[in-house]
């Protein structure tokens, strides 16, 4: 319909992307969350009424080092880890000797972090003392692979092994954590 239209993608995090939109430096912004009331109000004040609609869904995955035997925890456990109520692996399993739990996200302003704060912590800030921000999702996988006490949080699309053309094999360097709503 508009053959002369060209898009120049800018790959950035949610915070920078929203700021670019608010500053009217971009006209199109893909994000993983609905606009806040404040964002919506600012956009309406500056120009055209924003159109917001879902185009797809993604999932998040929790990953641990291959040497960590605890690969199944509850959503409540995750909430307690992120809120600082659980800080050591042996609080989840007395036999686990991995020490302090290090939680690793891709970056301080990622959509994954926003989702965890909004959906798991109900909008409350993360209070875990051992939070690490890697540069990107690949860095999270690498960090978890090298750090036995880490638990990484990534988009589920990062789990696939590129050597598997059927996309049914998880990465060999890490173990995917199973989450349960109830006690394991």
Residues of each region from the PLM?
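Exported/periplasmic ABC-transporter solute-binding proteins
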Residues: 1-26, 33-34, 41-44, 51-56, ...
């Amino acid at each position: 319909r508009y053959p002369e239209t060209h898009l120049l993608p800018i790959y950035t995090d949610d915070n920078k992307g929203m700021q670019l939109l608010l500053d009217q430096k971009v006209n199109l912004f893909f994000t993983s969350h609905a606009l806040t009331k404040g964002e919506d109000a600012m956009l309406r004040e500056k120009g055209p009424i924003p159109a917001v609609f879902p185009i797809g869904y993604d999932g998040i995955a929790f990953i641990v080092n291959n040497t960590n035997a605890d690969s199944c925890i509850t959503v409540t456990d995750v909430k307690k880890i992120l809120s600082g109520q659980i800080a050591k692996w042996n609080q989840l399993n007395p036999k686990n000797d991995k020490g302090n739990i290090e939680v690793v996200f891709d970056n301080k302003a990622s959509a994954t972090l926003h989702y965890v704060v909004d959906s798991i912590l109900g909008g409350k800030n993360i209070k875990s003392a051992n939070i690490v921000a890697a540069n990107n999702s690949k860095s999270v996988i690498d960090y978890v692979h090298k750090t036995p006490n880490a638990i990484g949080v990534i988009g589920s699309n990062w789990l696939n092994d590129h050597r598997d053309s059927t996309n049914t094999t998880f990465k060999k360097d890490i173990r995917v954590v199973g989450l349960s709503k109830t006690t394991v």
